[in-house]
From Swiss-Prot:
Full protein name: Small ribosomal subunit protein bS20
Record-linked InterPro entries: Ribosomal_bS20, Ribosomal_bS20_sf
MF GO annotations: small ribosomal subunit rRNA binding; structural constituent of ribosome
GO biological process, one term: translation
Region (Disordered): 1-20
Organism placement in taxonomy: Bacteria, Pseudomonadati, Pseudomonadota, Gammaproteobacteria, Enterobacterales
Gene Ontology CC: one annotated term: cytosol
Function: Binds directly to 16S ribosomal RNA.
Length: 88
């Protein structure tokens, strides 16, 4: 438990930030799932448009520090490899 007034404020702030980060991580997972569902349905154009949008969101969150830049690169690379395997 926080002892000082500033520690209590810091605790509140960290809780708010954790909630915000969880929301953003959930958003990223949703965009990734949209690409994967488009790949599963074998819809190349939908997969590519969803990939472009997902790529933009992942890069933005990697710049903000939500995820590591190497994880962002790995995710984009693996997802695009799945799209390429469709024969795109």
């Amino acid at each position: 438990m926080a002892n000082t007034k500033s520690a209590r404020k810091s605790l509140i702030k960290s809780k708010q930030q954790r909630k915000c980060n969880a929301s953003r991580r959930s958003m990223l997972r949703t965009f990734i799932k949209k690409v994967y569902t488009a790949i599963e349905t074998k819809d190349k154009t939908a997969a590519m448009t969803a990939f472009v949008f997902m790529q933009k969101k992942i890069d933005h969150q990697a710049c903000k520090g939500l995820i590591h830049k190497n994880k962002a690169a790995r995710c984009k690379s693996r997802t695009f490899a799945r799209i390429r395997s469709m024969g795109f």
